């Protein structure tokens, strides 16, 4: 019978439990750790007497309460209320007597009594319920009461039934259904309990232990005193931990209230696991070492369990003092909400909210109300926030000795932190109206502080987000200043800043154009970097103010958002006031900063102005206007007046775009020069008929203008074919060609490239007298890429354009036996398309149509040499003078600044070459030349070609 009851009936009950995932599912009912001592052959054992008839007769005679003892038993009976007039219908078993497989219906069975121990008496397979009405019209409760050392095994407590345990009694394998109750008092021990809609109570005066308990289907476990160990609370079920709840598991939909009955310093809960969807509320006392995947709330706002749910007091008044969670772990997806009281030693992988705003549980959800709860503030101490975790403070929430170890911290308005450390990429945001005391240490991570004006909460401290002390310990420590557009000014205040990292006057996600910040410091020390922003064309930007003292040496990087900065507006901008600063206190990163088209330098004020620092287009110190020394803090900034007539230095980006505007004419010229060499070759080989040819070209240009100097390397290939037409006293050669050429730019300001794809037509007219005319018509498609240096990094731009041109050369071939001389005059013209593009730094570039008009006169002389094998060699030399007539290839930067790109001037040109006719079909040629002029030097220009005659 015992095996049938447990292995069939109990699993059926378990199947009615709330379904959960495999990882968070209520366990099957526990096996009892003890078994009954009742003999298996009790009903046939001659040592035991069936005493049921006597019990029944005694009740029928009007005796309501009596005992049976000394190896008596009652078995297989439905024991019901016989006389409704009885205040209680009770039978007590003593001295190795047994109740087996009985139903107690509105009657009471005691195992042991208050005077005599049960002495081995037990109740086995008992059902307890109440269905009968007593003489007062009330349902009479069925009761199984264990006294002394009495024991019960496999008990089912149904509606209006009760299992009451006193003394040192023990109960194993108990099921309590809805309307049933199990009371564990004294020093009793209850193990393997299934509270299936019923109630289990550990009484106020007890030191009892309930172990291996499952509470489901709206059941309740009330621990007034004593200990409940290894309890599993299911959906819509409740546990009150007033004594000690040890190793409790709360499943989806479960609720636990920790309310110490022994005062706020008493641990009422230890090692609870709160699964997703479950809730734990600590109202009084201490919860230790909770593992939270669901929600843990620490609050002095009370409430009540009603109809399978917890309902908080509607007015959110704090009625209870002293609630605390110690050493909890808030896992990913979990939440710890501190409304009042304290959480100490929390490990946060999920979310910790330290927020004293009114609110409570309504319908299973947390509903916030307006206003502060008042009284005890919410406080988190010794918290560690790991990667993926968040600590958020608001509404007078406080956190001290916090380590943000890869996680995030948000200190919203009315929030307060003290002695915080950021490491392993952790971040902290202090919003307008939040503040930090103690030291905020950034070992490796980022601190963001939001600016503002005076806040009602922190106005007595300073403007905006406020910190008493911040310590940026290294290069990976960053302070961001977030602009506040909702206040009249955006000021952030730190009393003492130790700065060995980076202070960035913008938010981590970037900065909106035209929004700037002011940082107010009392003292500054260290060797860090400030990254600041300006709009010099508008005369506005970030500002750093150090009111008392500064020690150390700092780097400054500046970004400018102005798009129309003009040279006449390139005046010094007041960037820093630092009381007591020296000439080496601040220095610009890389010596200068590119702001629009110009370079700016960070300069120290003169003796009368030595605490002020300016962005200036001149490296010398600007002279301020006469007047009193500037006062620290807010107020009109000094307006230095730079020396007139000094031209500001161009920025690296400006130099790069000016250089790129010169690329296409020189690239076109490199291709044209090699094509003219080809025409000279076919003039010298006068027996030429028709054929195809190809050549490789390589040139280097060194270009220097008023604004830029750079090197341009050109490499490419050309392919073509032509045919000779004989005329009267002359010949005409006509051909076409295609080319690909690449130019690489290299300078102190940029490395860029240009790819050229060209096609062309050419012709030569040769008169028998030696006169000739060469003509070339060529068109190109250019693809350019510019990568200028920009404030320690690079900016980029790509552009496409087209161009074309023509060349005419007139000369005479004069033969002097084996020698020849060719004087010539040549003119070439090129024009490129106007171009307009933008660097990704925001600089706008508009380049006029690139133009070139060149005239050249020169002399080629050489000798015909015939080798023994018939090979014809024609070594030659060339000298020439060339002049570029075009002066104004203008470039406009940021729609306002116009720069002339003047490559005009005269140059001398010298070259050596050789043409070889190898046989009737094949010939080859090569040439190398040097050219030097005012703006362009060509250290070498070389080509190698080969031709096949049909």
Label every PLM stretch briefly.
Residues 1-24:
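Gram-negative bacterial Sec-dependent N-terminal signal peptides
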Residues 2, 24-30, 34, 47, ...:
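Outer-membrane translocation/initiation segment of Type V secreted surface proteins
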Residues 66, 89, 93, 112-116, ...:
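Extracellular beta-strand repeat scaffolds in secreted/surface proteins
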Residues 324, 347, 364, 379, ...:
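Extracellular beta-solenoid/beta-roll
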Residues 25, 99, 115-118, 263, ...:
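Acidic Ser/Thr/Pro-rich low-complexity disordered segments
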């Amino acid at each position: 019978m015992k095996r049938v009851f447990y292995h069939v009936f109990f699993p059926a009950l378990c199947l009615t439990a709330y379904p959960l995932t495999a990882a968070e599912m209520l366990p099957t009912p526990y096996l009892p750790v003890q078994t009954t001592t009742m003999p298996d052959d009790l009903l046939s054992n001659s040592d035991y007497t069936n005493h049921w008839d006597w019990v029944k007769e005694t009740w029928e005679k009007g005796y309501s309460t009596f005992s049976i003892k000394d190896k008596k038993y009652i078995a297989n009976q439905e024991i019901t209320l016989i006389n409704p007039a009885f205040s209680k219908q009770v039978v007590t078993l003593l001295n190795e007597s047994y109740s087996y497989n009985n139903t107690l219906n509105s009657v009471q069975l005691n195992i042991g009594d208050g005077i005599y121990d049960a002495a081995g008496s037990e109740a086995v397979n008992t059902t307890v319920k109440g269905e009968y009405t007593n003489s007062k019209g009330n349902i009479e409760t069925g009761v199984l009461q264990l006294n002394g050392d009495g024991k019960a095994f496999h008990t089912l407590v149904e509606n209006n039934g009760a299992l009451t345990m006193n003394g040192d009694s023990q109960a194993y394998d108990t099921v309590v259904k809805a309307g049933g109750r199990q009371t564990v008092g004294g020093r009793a021990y209850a193990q393997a309990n299934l509270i299936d809609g019923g109630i289990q109570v550990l009484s106020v005066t007890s030191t009892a232990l309930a172990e291996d308990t499952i509470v489901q289907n709206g059941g309740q476990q009330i621990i007034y005193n004593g200990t409940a160990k290894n309890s599993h609370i299911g959906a819509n079920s409740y546990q009150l931990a007033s004594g000690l709840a040890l190793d409790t598991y709360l499943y989806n939909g479960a609720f636990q209230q920790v309310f110490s009955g022994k005062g706020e310093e008493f641990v009422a809960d230890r090692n609870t696991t709160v699964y997703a969807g479950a809730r734990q509320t600590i109202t009084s006392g201490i919860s230790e070492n909770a593992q939270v995947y669901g929600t843990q709330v620490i609050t002095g706002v009370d409430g009540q369990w009603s109809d399978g749910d917890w309902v908080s007091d509607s007015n959110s008044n704090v009625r209870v003092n002293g609630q605390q969670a110690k050493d909890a772990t808030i896992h990913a997806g979990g939440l710890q909400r501190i409304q009042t009281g304290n959480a100490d030693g929390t490990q946060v992988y999920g979310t910790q909210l330290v927020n004293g705003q009114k609110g409570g549980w309504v319908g299973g959800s947390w509903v916030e109300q307006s206003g502060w709860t008042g009284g005890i503030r919410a406080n988190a101490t010794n918290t560690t926030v790991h990667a993926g975790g968040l600590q958020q403070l608001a509404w007078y929430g406080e956190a001290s000795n916090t380590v943000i170890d890869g996680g995030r911290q948000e200190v919203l308005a009315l929030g307060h932190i003290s002695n915080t450390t950021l490491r392993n990429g952790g971040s902290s945001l202090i919003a307008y109206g939040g503040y930090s005391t103690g030291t905020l240490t950034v070992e490796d991570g980022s601190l963001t502080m939001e600016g503002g004006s005076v806040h009602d909460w922190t106005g007595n401290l300073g403007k905006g987000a406020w910190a008493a002390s911040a310590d940026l310990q290294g290069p990976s420590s960053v302070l961001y200043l977030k602009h506040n557009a909702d206040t009249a000014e955006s000021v952030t205040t730190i009393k003492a800043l130790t700065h060995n990292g980076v202070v960035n006057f913008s938010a981590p996600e970037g900065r909106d154009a035209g929004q700037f910040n002011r940082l107010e410091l009392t003292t500054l020390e260290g060797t860090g970097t400030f990254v600041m922003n300006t709009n010099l064309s508008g005369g506005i930007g970030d500002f750093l103010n150090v009111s008392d003292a500064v020690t150390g040496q700092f780097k400054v990087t500046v970004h400018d958002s102005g798009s129309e900065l003009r040279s006449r507006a390139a005046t010094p901008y007041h960037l820093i006031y630092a009381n007591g600063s020296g000439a080496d206190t601040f220095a610009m990163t890389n010596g200068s900063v590119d702001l629009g088209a110009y370079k700016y330098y960070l300069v120290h004020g003169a003796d009368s102005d030595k605490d002020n620092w300016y962005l200036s287009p001149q490296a010398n110190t600007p002279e301020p206007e006469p007047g009193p020394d500037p006062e620290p803090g807010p107020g009109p900034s000094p307006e230095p007046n730079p020396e007139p007539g000094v031209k500001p230095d161009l920025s690296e980006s400006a130099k790069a775009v000016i250089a790129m505007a010169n690329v296409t004419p020189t690239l076109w010229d490199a291709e044209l020069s090699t094509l003219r060499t080809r025409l000279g070759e076919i003039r010298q080989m006068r027996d030429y008929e028709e054929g195809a040819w190809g050549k490789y070209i390589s040139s280097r240009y060194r270009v220097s203008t008023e604004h830029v100097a750079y090197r341009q390397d050109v490499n490419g290939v050309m392919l073509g074919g032509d045919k000779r037409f004989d005329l009267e006293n002359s010949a005409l050669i006509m051909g076409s060609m295609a080319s690909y050429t690449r130019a690489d730019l290299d300078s102190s300001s940029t490395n860029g490239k240009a790819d050229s794809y060209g096609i062309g037509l050419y012709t030569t007219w040769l008169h028998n007298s030696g006169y000739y005319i060469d003509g070339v018509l060529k068109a190109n498609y250019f693809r350019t890429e510019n990568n200028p240096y920009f404030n320690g990094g690079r900016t980029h731009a790509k552009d496409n354009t087209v161009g074309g041109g023509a060349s005419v050369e007139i000369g005479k071939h004069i033969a002097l036996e084996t020698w020849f001389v060719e004087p010539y005059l040549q003119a070439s013209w090129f024009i490129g398309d106007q171009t307009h593009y933008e660097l990704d730094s925001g600089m706008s570039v508009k380049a006029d149509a690139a133009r070139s008009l060149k005239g050249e006169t020169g002399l080629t002389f050489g000798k015909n040499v015939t080798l023994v094998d018939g090979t014809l060699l024609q070594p030659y030399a060339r000298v020439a003078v060339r002049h570029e007539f075009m002066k104004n290839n203008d470039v406009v930067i940021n729609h306002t600044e116009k720069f002339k790109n003047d490559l005009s001037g005269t140059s001398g040109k010298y070259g050596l070459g050789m043409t070889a006719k190898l046989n009737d079909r094949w010939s080859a040629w090569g040439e190398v030349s040097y050219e030097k002029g005012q703006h362009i030097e060509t250290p070498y220009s070389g080509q190698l070609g080969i031709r096949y005659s049909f």
